[in-house]
A protein has these predicted regions:
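Amphipathic alpha-helical "stalk" segments
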Residues: 1-224
Length: 224
C-alpha cells in the first residue's frame, strides 16, 4: 500500500487487486518516493528555466525517469498504459505529485530525443527531417499497443492469427508515422534496432513482445 492516501484512493479506481499486487510503484516506500520527488524537482527546474528538452541534461533525466517508470510498472506495458490513463484523468493527482501534463510531455520530448539521436546515425538528411517532424506525435499510443500485444501473448494468440495480423497492422501504422513508407528507409530503422541496444532502454518492448510483432508483421507482408 502506498504511503500517500490520495495515490491509494485513485489507484483503486483504475487497477484491479491483482494488478496492484504486481505494481511496484504502488508499494513504494519513503526512499523510493523521495527518489521520484527529487527527479521531478530536477526536471521541473530545467523546464521552468527554459532549458530545451533536447539539452543533454534533460535527456539524462528523461532516461532516468523512463527507466524508473519501467521498473515501477514491473516492465508490464499494460500497467504502464493504465498508469498513464489514471494520470491523464486525475488533475488532483497531477497537482499532488507535481507531475503536470506539461512536465510529462517535456520528459517525453527529451526521451524521444535520445532515440532520434541514435537513429540519425543511420538516416539521410531528408529522412531525419521527416522523423523529427513526426516521431513524438503519437508517442502516447505505444504503451496501449504494447499492452494489447502482451495480452495477446498471454492469451495464447499466435502471430499468424487474424488478431496477430491486426496488431501487426497497428504496429506498422505507428512505425510508418515517423519512418515513412519507403521500404529502404524502414530497413534503416530496423537495422538501427538490431545494432543499438540503447534504443530499448526505458521501453516496455522485451524480446518476447518484439518476436511476436516481427512474426506477425512477416505474416502480414506475405499475405499482401
Amino acid at each position: 500500500m502506498p504511503h500517500n492516501p490520495l495515490i491509494f484512493q485513485k489507484s483503486q479506481k483504475y487497477f484491479s487487486r491483482d494488478e496492484l499486487a504486481r505494481l511496484p510503484v504502488y508499494r513504494n516506500g519513503p526512499e523510493a518516493e523521495a527518489g521520484w520527488d527529487n527527479l521531478v524537482e530536477q526536471v521541473r527546474a530545467l523546464m521552468e528555466s527554459g532549458t530545451p528538452p533536447e539539452h543533454e541534461k534533460a535527456r539524462e533525466l528523461a532516461i532516468r525517469w523512463m527507466t524508473m517508470l519501467v521498473f515501477d510498472t514491473n516492465g508490464d506495458p499494460r500497467l504502464a498504459a493504465k498508469l498513464n490513463h489514471m494520470h491523464e484523468n486525475e488533475p488532483s493527482l497531477q497537482a499532488h505529485i507535481g507531475i503536470s501534463l506539461a512536465l510529462r510531455d517535456y520528459v517525453l520530448r527529451a526521451f524521444s530525443e535520445t532515440k532520434m539521436l541514435i537513429y540519425e546515425k543511420y538516416l539521410s538528411p531528408g529522412e531525419i527531417r521527416f522523423m523529427r517532424a513526426n516521431y513524438g506525435k503519437r508517442a502516447m499510443e505505444w504503451p496501449q499497443l504494447m499492452a494489447d500485444v502482451r495480452d495477446a501473448i498471454d492469451e495464447g494468440i499466435t502471430p499468424d492469427s487474424p488478431q496477430g495480423a491486426e496488431l501487426a497492422r497497428r504496429w506498422l501504422d505507428l512505425f510508418r508515422s515517423y519512418a515513412g513508407d519507403d521500404p529502404g528507409t524502414q530497413l534503416k530503422f530496423r537495422k538501427a534496432l538490431e545494432n543499438e541496444p540503447d534504443l530499448m532502454i526505458g521501453t516496455w518492448a522485451d524480446e518476447a513482445l518484439l518476436t511476436f510483432v516481427r512474426q506477425a508483421m512477416s505474416r502480414v507482408v506475405q499475405l499482401n
